[in-house]
Amino acid sequence: MKTILRNLFYTLKRFQTASVLNLMGLSAAFAAFVLLMMKVSYERDFDTCYPHADRLVMLNLARPQEENYVSTLPRGPIDYLIQQVPGIEYGTIYSPAWQKQAFYTDPKNPQYFYEEPWAVYPDFGKIIGLKFVEGSDQEMNRPESVIVSESYAHKLFPNGNALGSYLYTDTPEWRNPEATKFRICGIFEDLPENCQFKNDLFVPMGKLQENDWGSQNFFAFFLLKPGVSVEEVNQQIAATEANKRLFTGDQGTQKLYVLPIQKLYYDMYSPYYFKTGSRSTMTLLVSIGFLIILIACINLINFSTALAPVRMRSINTQKVLGSTNGELRRALVAESVSIVLIGWLLSLGIVAALIRLNVLSFMGFTPSLLVYWKYVLYTGVIALLTGIVAGLYPSWYMTSFPPALVLKGNYALSGKGKRLRTVLIGFQYIVSFALIVTAAFIFLQNRFMRNHELGIDKDQILVASLPQMPYHSSPYRKFDSQLKSFAEIDDIAYAKWELGATEGYTQYTFRYKGNNYGHQYIDVTTNFCRVMGMHILSGSDFLPSDSIYTSQLNFIATQDLQEESSIPAGETLDFFPWGMSATLKGYVNNVQFTSLKTGSVPYIFCPNGIYSNNVLPFAYIRVKAGSNMDSALQHIRQTMSECFTGYPTEVKFYDQIYGQLYQKETNQQKIITWFSLLAILISLVGVFGLIIFEAAHRRKEIGVRKVYGASTGQILWMFGRSYLTLSIVCSLLASPIAWYAISEWLKQFNEKIPISPWVFLITCAIISLITLITITIQNYRTARNNPINSLKSE
C-alpha cells in the first residue's frame, strides 16, 4: 500500500498540471452540486414548516379553464364558510396591503419607512403555528394591535424594547381606517424563507367589506379539524349556499373549494404575492447536479486510466512481491475515494467563500451550510459513492494484465482503450452541448420578453414611488409644480399601481346588454394615457372634468375589450360591483403591464373611482425626447427630497420595473448558464488532462513524424482531428435532447421565440473551437520540440 501511494504521489507530481486541473474540476463540480442540493432542499421542503401542515388549506375560486389559478375572494364567503363548514377548526382572512404604507416609531422625530402589513383574523397564529418569544396574539381582536417577527423587532428597536411599543402612521390603514397607531402585542419567531407567510408585520382585519360577496380583494386559509380530509370539506362547502350567493360576475361557472397549502407552491399559478415553483424545475436542478458530478466522475476515471501505463510496472512489482489482485484493487479504490473526498472538502470551502462574498443571489434563496446541513452531509455520502464507482474500473483495469503484456505495449493507446475514452468524453460533450443550448434559448426568450412591445413610450418614462397621500395634497402639488418647471420634463401623470411590477391588478366585471366582461381596473389621473404614449383609437381622451366624483364613472379601455365585446365608444356600462354606471369614453391601443406568461386581459383606466380616495402614489414622469436622463433623474430626486421630507422615495426607469416580472426566469437562466459553463469547463479539463498524457505517450511517434517532414500544423491537426469529429458527432446526438427540453420549457409562455437551428450550429462551433484551442495550446510545445530529443528520451 505504501509503495502504491508513493508511486501515485510521484506520478501526480510528474503530471502536476493535469492532476491539479482534475482536482479543481472535481472540487468545482461538488461545489455546484452542494449549491444545487441546497436549492432542491429549499424547493422540496416549501411550506412544510407548519406544525399542522397536513391540515392547512387555502380557499380558492375555480373558474372555467383556470382551475390552477389563485383567485382573490370577496370577504362575504370567507366569513360564511368559517361559520358554516363543520370541518373547519379555525379560519383567517389573509389580506394584502396592495400598497406600501409609511410607518414611524418616534412621533417626536418621524423617520418614515415603508412596510406592507397583512391583515388577518385573531386565529391566524393558531392556524400556521406561530411561536411567540415575547407577548402573544391574544390582543389581535383589537384594531390597534400588531404582531411582528423577531428579526423585525430587533431592526426597529435595537435596544430590545419592542414589546408594547407603537408603530405610527399618518395615513389610515384602508382595512382598518380607525387605527392610526399600532401597539406591538406579540413578537414571533422568524418563519423560514421557504414558506408563504414569510412576512414581518400582521395587523387585525377591520370591518371593511363585511358581507360583501362581490369585491375580490382577499385570500383565506383554514385549519381543518383532525381527521377531516380536503375532499370532505369540499363536499361540505358545496352543500352550503356559498356558490349561489357569489356575486363576482360569473355566477354558475365558479366554485369555491380548498386545496392543501403545499399544492399552492407546486401546482398553482398566482399573479399576486404568493411564491410558486414547479416540480419540473426541481427535477431539472437535480438532473443538472448529477450530470455535473457524472462528468467529474468520468474525468476521474479517464485520469486514473490514463495514469495506468505509468503505474503498471509498480503495480505488477507488488504482484510479484505477493500482493493479491483484491488487495491492490481495494488500495486503488481507496485512492479514488480519498481524492474525491478531498475534492468534496475543498468544495465546501468554495461554497463558504461564495456565500461570504454574497454572489449567489441569482440562486433565488439564501444558501447556508448550517441551515441545509443535512443535504450537505448527503452530498458527502454521494462523494463517497462517487469515489468508489470512479475507482472500480481503473482498479480492475490496472490489475488485470499479466506482467508480460505490460512489458510489451501500451494498452492505454490501443484501440480498446481509445474507444473507452471516446465513449466517456462523448458523454461529457453531449451533456455540455445540451446544457449550453438550453441556457442560450432561455437567454433569448428572456431578452425577447424584456424587449417586447409594451404599447407605451417606456424609454421616455420614469416612475417615482411617493408617499400614500392624496395627489392633490400640498406636497404633491409642490412636487408637480417644481418638476414641470424643469425644461426636460414634459408632463406628469399619477396612478394607483406601479404598473409592470406585478402579474395582476384589481379585477372587476361590468355588464353590457346582459353579458359580463372582466377587466383589470386602474385608477389614474386624466392625462395618464397621453403621458404614457397610448394612442386613442376611437372615442375621446379624458377631460380634466372627468376626475370629478359623480354617480357616473368614466372609463377608457384597451383595444382587447373592443375586440372581445364590440361595445362602441360612448356607451353606458353597468358597473354593478359598485352599484354604479360608467361611460366608456374611448379605446386605446393594447398595453402589456404583465409578463408574457399571463393571458391578455383588457385594461380599464378610471380617473374618478370612489375607492382610490385620491391616493395615487406612483408618478409617471414623461421626459422630453432627446433630454439628458441623468440630469432629469437628479432633478427628480432632489425635488422628491424637498417635497416629501422624511419619507423614503424612489425613482426608476420603466425598464427596471418591468424587468422585475422576469426575475425568476433571469435567475433560472443564470443558474443554468453558470452550471452549463461549469460542465463544459470540467469536460475541457478532462480533455486537457488526457491530451497531456497522450502527448507524453506519443512523443516517439511525433518525433518520427517530424523526422519524415511533418509540420507543426500537421502534428496539431493529428491531435485535434479526433476530438473535433467527436464534438461534432456528440452535438448532433445531443440536439434532439436539447430541442425537447427547450420546447417543453417554452410552453409556459403565451408568446415565445422560435427554436432556431442557428443556436445549435453556433453552440457546436463554439464547443469545437474551444476544444481546438485547448488542444493547440497544450500540444504546441510538444509539436515544436526537436525530434532528436524525443527519440533520444524514448
Q: Would you name each region that the model predicts?
A:
Residues 14-42, 277-313, 340-341, 420-445, ...:
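Hydrophobic alpha-helical transmembrane segments of multi-pass inner-membrane transport and secretion
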Residues 21, 28-55, 358-363, 431-459, ...:
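Alpha-helical transmembrane segments
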Residues 12, 22, 43, 59, ...:
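Generic structural signal for small/hydrophobic residues in well-ordered secondary structure
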Residues 1-5, 10, 14-18, 50, ...:
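Membrane-helix entry/capping segments
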Residues 118-133, 146-277, 481-661:
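Mid-to-C-terminal secondary-structure elements
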Residues 5-21, 25, 296-339, 400-411, ...:
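Intracellular coupling helices
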Residues 36-101, 209-210, 215-222, 234-235, ...:
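Membrane-proximal extracellular/periplasmic loop immediately following the first transmembrane helix
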Residues 31, 35, 257, 336-403, ...:
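Small-residue-rich transmembrane alpha-helices
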